[in-house]
Design a protein with these regions (language model features):
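Expand to "…catalyze enediolate/carbanion chemistry for C-C bond making/breaking, isomerization
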Residues: 1-141
Length: 141
């Protein structure tokens, strides 16, 4: 599933603003629909300003926050920017590994929640960490 922001804003006579706030509702609905349908995360809309890397990165981050798994690209220069946002960083991978390892150790002792580096960790956080590790494994191996 992919989101076409241009089609969406045309159909609803919206003005596609720089902060993309007019896209928030559709992004949320698509992300929910993909999840409810047990589909892969949807792919986010294009950015028309092909020479504006910062705008592209901001848009990609918004898409990622809404659960999108990637970004449609209309220019080759946008591909590495997409990877920059949607590929887990070394820090994210290290943190995810630490979360999973600490939780598995705690779970072996009968605990279903822990504190790690000042953060509460329970099953949803562990599952998210496992998802990050699986994504990193599939993209980086």
């Amino acid at each position: 599933m992919a989101f076409g922001g241009g089609d969406y804003t045309l159909d609803l006579n919206y003005e596609w603003n720089a902060d993309e706030s007019v896209l928030a509702y559709a992004r949320a609905k698509l992300s929910h629909a993909a999840r409810l349908g047990n589909l892969e995360p949807p792919i986010d809309t294009v950015v028309l300003q092909i020479k504006d890397d910062e705008r592209f990165l901001q848009s990609a981050r918004h898409g990622k926050q809404f659960g999108f798994g990637g970004k449609l690209c209309i220019h080759p220069a946008q591909i590495p920017l997409t990877h920059q946002v949607f590929t887990p960083s070394d820090e994210e991978i290290a943190h995810a590994r630490a979360v999973v390892a600490a939780f598995e150790a705690a779970e072996a002792e009968g605990s279903a929640s822990i504190q790690l580096d000042g953060y509460f960790i329970d099953y949803p956080i562990v599952y998210k960490s496992q998802r990050i590790l699986a994504l990193a494994d599939s993209l980086l191996s």
